[in-house]
């Protein structure tokens, strides 16, 4: 497990974007070899997406041979609703890059058969060769995707009822009106993410500090689903200084002492530009 600690949100976002960029380029994707990337929504990854868009526009990075799989989608929210995750991904990322829309996979929360939709999503991931790198964020209660506290740590893509804490947290996106917030969602399972060859979790802000503490300093616990990734062979937690406030001083000191190693993963930043 790696814990990468940056000074602030902007630097954490940039480090994560550089890492994704380098992983894609080093993979050497092509028409017969697509890079598969799991993606989150929410406020945390926005800075990372902006940097990836910059790398694309500068010619350093192409998503032509990348397939993406998003973590989740609300049930019953129209696809073109401004708060649907289809809209989020299109407006904040996909419309700014060269990904083929047919390669951007997002669960359909309006499918006539939601169980079949979940099973089909798992099948598509398998047919794509599995996820090479799954990027995620967490809630203050340590949930990843919509795997709320108490979720099975071997769960697969499924229909989930959202916890009241999640509904309250999401109300800000629906004019503060709880009656407008969806109460159910389709989500990848913890087991789905664990199957990825590598997982990178973005955690920023003091309000996520206790969740980071639970994620790495205490044992695996289904009440803090992010803690499952202690058992993944290749997990990277990327955080800012504020998110470390609940960690032991010696933990922070230990991982900061490894930053020269971590920075070799992103420096130099690779490029797809032709020399």
Swiss-Prot record:
The active site is at residues 72, 141, 143, 148. Residues 103-131 form a coiled coil. NCBIfam families: nagB (TIGR00502). PROSITE patterns: GLC_GALNAC_ISOMERASE. Keywords: Carbohydrate metabolism, Coiled coil, Cytoplasm, Hydrolase. Gene3D superfamilies: 3.40.50.1360. This is Glucosamine-6-phosphate deaminase 2. Homohexamer. Its EC number is 3.5.99.6. GO terms for biological process: carbohydrate metabolic process; N-acetylglucosamine metabolic process. The lineage of its organism: Eukaryota, Metazoa, Chordata, Craniata, Vertebrata. Catalyzes the reversible conversion of alpha-D-glucosamine 6-phosphate (GlcN-6P) into beta-D-fructose 6-phosphate (Fru-6P) and ammonium ion, a regulatory reaction step in de novo uridine diphosphate-N-acetyl-alpha-D-glucosamine (UDP-GlcNAc) biosynthesis via hexosamine pathway. Belongs to the glucosamine/galactosamine-6-phosphate isomerase family. The keyword Repressor does not apply.
